[in-house]
Amino acid sequence: MNILTDPLKLKTSGCADANASKCAEGDGEGSVQVQLDPNVKIGSAKVFSIYGKGGIGKSTTSSNLSVAFSKLGKRVLQIGCDPKHDSTFTLTKRLIPTVIDVLEEVNFHSEELRPEDFVFEGYNGVMCLEAGGPPAGTGCGGYVVGQTVKLLKEHHLLEDTDVVIFDVLGDVVCGGFAAPLQHSERAMIVAANDFDSIFAANRIAAAIAAKSKNYGVRLGGIIANRSKDTDQIDKFGERTGIRRIAHLPDLDVIRKSRLKKMTLFEMDHTDEILAVQQEYLRLATEMWEAKEPPIEGKPLKDRDIFDLLGFD
């Protein structure tokens, strides 16, 4: 096993020597640490994690962002981290087998697998992988992510990759599903212009802040999705310092693209579609160039979120 879990009150183990003192600090009171084996790290690729409230459009956002990076000439790998394993659906036009599926077929003897058993090429050369997850109520999503990265390294599949995008299950911020943060440089939060998704975004921002104590991940900002307006997101940003970095409007054509098993870059080039494509390309360029400093926002307490947004 390449991921260790320890209650904060226990002495930590499995951290690299250089980070031992930081790992011993933990993420916060009462946290359970999901620690990486120091040998299981993604190499030189830029790594981004996409979080957000369940059903907010993370997979659509992740897939179109992956294509945008590929249009910029980058070699992209998208990793779906949801048991539904539909993150890469619009890229590959099908539900591909998960890492857990293929490992089970060989009784978890990973040396028997070939890269083509679990990595599939999607639209415009984007490489696609679905980590999957343990059966409901059992196991740890963080372990699954760790096994996935380990498998990629064993087959040298990260050596020719410029960008890795983790598309992460819903708004679960437990130690397991926060595991992609330990690999990432930046974590982006997808949110709509409504109370529920901003409430979830605030919780996720707190999880990112906790992980940033011990790892290199920093908050990249909020991607406003399925929203005509952004006034509530911007109001939240003014209070917390967590800025909006993109705005993807509430267009029916975006919903239809998923029904057609297409990314937005494959749809008919209407003015609406071209505008959204340009927004994705702009965002991908900014994420790659990383000219903006990381966000040092201050998430609010739950009660303060209600006071800020809940009683208008």
Curated annotation (Swiss-Prot):
Its cofactor is [4Fe-4S] cluster. PROSITE patterns: NIFH_FRXC_1 (PS00746), NIFH_FRXC_2 (PS00692), NIFH_FRXC_3 (PS51026). It comes from the Bacteria. Binds 1 [4Fe-4S] cluster per dimer. Transmembrane segments: none annotated. ATP binds at G55, I56, G57, K58, S59, T60, K84, N225, R226, P249, D250, L251. The keyword Metal-binding applies. Mg(2+) binds at S59. Keywords: 4Fe-4S, ATP-binding, Bacteriochlorophyll biosynthesis, Chlorophyll biosynthesis, Iron, Iron-sulfur, Magnesium, Metal-binding, Nucleotide-binding, Oxidoreductase, Photosynthesis. Its EC number is 1.3.7.7. The keyword Iron applies. GO terms for biological process: light-independent bacteriochlorophyll biosynthetic process; photosynthesis, dark reaction. Pfam families: Fer4_NifH. It catalyses: chlorophyllide a + oxidized 2[4Fe-4S]-[ferredoxin] + 2 ADP + 2 phosphate = protochlorophyllide a + reduced 2[4Fe-4S]-[ferredoxin] + 2 ATP + 2 H2O. InterPro entries: NifH/chlL_CS, NifH/frxC, P-loop_NTPase, Protochlorophyllide_ATP-bd. [4Fe-4S] cluster binds at C140, C174. Pathway: Porphyrin-containing compound metabolism; bacteriochlorophyll biosynthesis (light-independent). One of its GO terms (molecular function) is oxidoreductase activity, acting on the CH-CH group of donors, iron-sulfur protein as acceptor. HAMAP family: ChlL_BchL. Component of the dark-operative protochlorophyllide reductase (DPOR) that uses Mg-ATP and reduced ferredoxin to reduce ring D of protochlorophyllide (Pchlide) to form chlorophyllide a (Chlide). This reaction is light-independent. The L component serves as a unique electron donor to the NB-component of the complex, and binds Mg-ATP. Belongs to the NifH/BchL/ChlL family. Homodimer. Protochlorophyllide reductase is composed of three subunits; BchL, BchN and BchB. This is Light-independent protochlorophyllide reductase iron-sulfur ATP-binding protein.
